[in-house]
Amino acid sequence: MKKALQVAMFSLFTVIGFNAQANEHHHETMSEAQPQVISATGVVKGIDLESKKITIHHDPIAAVNWPEMTMRFTITPQTKMSEIKTGDKVAFNFVQQGNLSLLQDIKVSQ
């Protein structure tokens, strides 16, 4: 009987101890990593609003280890394109999402 009581008490305190430890573990809200916003400069070579693409010959972009080249960027709903035209020198920001370069902001530069 004494042995059974010892086993029962040990089991009870073990369960209480584990519950106390579990309650001390705080689950922090994990925020999703925000994509890196990359800044660049270049010259607009073409705009296709129907397919939501803009072609820019950009300077080297160190943040993504890209050399100077001409490439297409996807125009997003937040991109204000009203003052941009082919031939403009521009400063722009984009995020890389897989194979897509999503244009976030673009402005005519001097």
Curated annotation (Swiss-Prot):
Annotated localization: Periplasm
Keyword annotations of the record: Copper, Metal-binding, Periplasm, Signal
UniProt-listed InterPro entries: CusF_Ec, CusF_sf
Cellular component annotations (GO), alphabetically ordered: outer membrane-bounded periplasmic space; periplasmic space
Induction: Transcriptionally regulated by CusR in response to copper and silver ions.
Pfam families per the UniProt record, alphabetical: CusF_Ec
Signal peptide start and end residues: 1-21
Keyword Signal: yes
GO biological process: copper ion export; copper ion transmembrane transport; detoxification of copper ion; intracellular copper ion homeostasis; response to copper ion; response to silver ion; response to toxic substance; response to zinc ion
Principal subcellular localisation of the protein: periplasm
Keyword set includes Metal-binding: yes
Gene Ontology MF annotations: copper chaperone activity; copper ion binding; metallochaperone activity; transition metal ion binding
Note: The cus system plays an important role in copper tolerance under anaerobic growth and, under extreme copper stress, in aerobic growth.
Subunit structure: The cus efflux system is composed of CusA, CusB, CusC and CusF. Interacts with copper-exporting P-type ATPase CopA; when this protein is precharged with copper it binds very little CopA.
Function: Part of a cation efflux system that mediates resistance to copper and silver. Binds one copper per polypeptide.
NCBIfam families listed in its UniProt record: PRK09838.1
Name listed for the protein in its UniProt record: Cation efflux system protein CusF
Source organism of this protein record: Escherichia coli (strain K12)
